[in-house]
Amino acid sequence: MNLTTMGQAAKAAAFDLAVAPTAQKNKALAIIADELEANKDAILAANEKDIKAAVEAGISEAMQDRLLLTEERLVGIANDVRNVINLNDPVGSEIDSKVLENGMSLSRRRVPIGVIGVIYEARPNVTIDIASLCLKTGNASILRGGKETFFSNMELVKVIQVALEKAGLPAASVQYIEKPDRELVSQLLTMDDYVDMIIPRGGAGLHKMCKENSSIPVIIGGFGISHAFVDESADLERALVVVDNSKAQRPSACNALDTLLVHEAVAPQFLALLVNNMAGRVELVAEPKAYGLLKEFEGVSLREAQEGDFDTEWLSYTLGVKVVADVNEAAAHMQKHNASHSDTILTNNIESAEKFINTAGSAAVYVNASTRFTDGAQFGLGAEVAVSTQKLHARGPMGLEELTSYKWVGKADYLIRS
């Protein structure tokens, strides 16, 4: 596999995509959605191969859930693509404009970034999400998925490329690095002649490797510890529902709850509710104060927290629990333990809510809402290419606008500079 050739093809495709009309891009998206449903048997058969290999390799059930495609999930993915069709195309839109004193009309106009390289692990739906958003914004993409979803991704990329050709767009608009060789990833990270942005979606190790080795700007997406703080003023019964949704609705998601912080004034009552709700489903990993309260209950899966536990993105039915004195201690804990993704406070106190919002360093902060809302579709952005946990160039769910840059456009009447 020659990555230089792929890069050259992607760059050429990016020029075509940059000037493709919205109608043509939407046509390609519509065909992708239809082809996903028309080829469901082949896609699900390929996914079965990936799941079988995962079981044989002893991959955790949480990770297997990330790999799994079902007919229902496939329909959902196709509908997500159709939702992207209905979103406004940001390419060519003016961000702002003004007329200068010299008579020049000056504006900033949204343009595609160019070629985007995305390195991701496990979830096959990411392949479609990335391709559809890049296509809508006129960007070519080079994808490198995890070896765990090799067969699924190959089938999905085949569907995408067929759809592109049917719509009259270059098949090289979306390319896939088939070999799992890590050396190819290292090579991709240095292809700054062809690739304009790298987005790694995975764990801390992948992010670190990309930041240290890439000569291309990197957007860090996905990893971060998510927290919920139950304040003393919270409606405890309703707070429990939010905590349960944050943790247990889909624990393998990157926006699932990792650490629960509970105000000491309500800790005995709330932890009793928590145990009653989560016994037999969730393992609790508790610091000393919380452990002292939780060990009194029967039927709880419980262990004492060890060093590093509160820095762990669990992605499973495990939850860190800590009792804190107030919102200030909650904020201090979050700052220490990589609160960069999604955090929520459950409270009926406006001052506590505002303090939490202002001190939380995460990309998405909620008041009385589940952390599970940090998602492009939930935010009305369509699908997402990543959830950026850094502060530049984008932050939070990266939808269409976050996949564009801008150019300055000046219009005048044969104007010269004096």
From Swiss-Prot:
Entry annotated with the keyword DNA-binding: no
Superkingdom in the source lineage: Bacteria
Protein location: Cytoplasm
Family: Belongs to the gamma-glutamyl phosphate reductase family.
UniProt catalytic activity: L-glutamate 5-semialdehyde + phosphate + NADP(+) = L-glutamyl 5-phosphate + NADPH + H(+)
Top EC class, one word: oxidoreductase
Transmembrane helix among keywords: no
Name of encoding gene: proA
Function text: Catalyzes the NADPH-dependent reduction of L-glutamate 5-phosphate into L-glutamate 5-semialdehyde and phosphate. The product spontaneously undergoes cyclization to form 1-pyrroline-5-carboxylate.
CDD domains membership: ALDH_F18-19_ProA-GPR
EC number per UniProt: 1.2.1.41
GO terms assigned for molecular function: glutamate-5-semialdehyde dehydrogenase activity; NADP binding
Gene3D superfamilies from the UniProt entry: Aldehyde Dehydrogenase, Chain A, domain 1 (3.40.605.10), Aldehyde Dehydrogenase, Chain A, domain 2 (3.40.309.10)
Name of the protein: Gamma-glutamyl phosphate reductase
HAMAP family documented for this protein: ProA (MF_00412)
Biological processes annotated in GO: L-proline biosynthetic process
Any one GO cellular component localisation term in the record: cytoplasm
UniProt keyword list: Amino-acid biosynthesis, Cytoplasm, NADP, Oxidoreductase, Proline biosynthesis
Pathway named in the protein's UniProt entry: Amino-acid biosynthesis; L-proline biosynthesis; L-glutamate 5-semialdehyde from L-glutamate: step 2/2
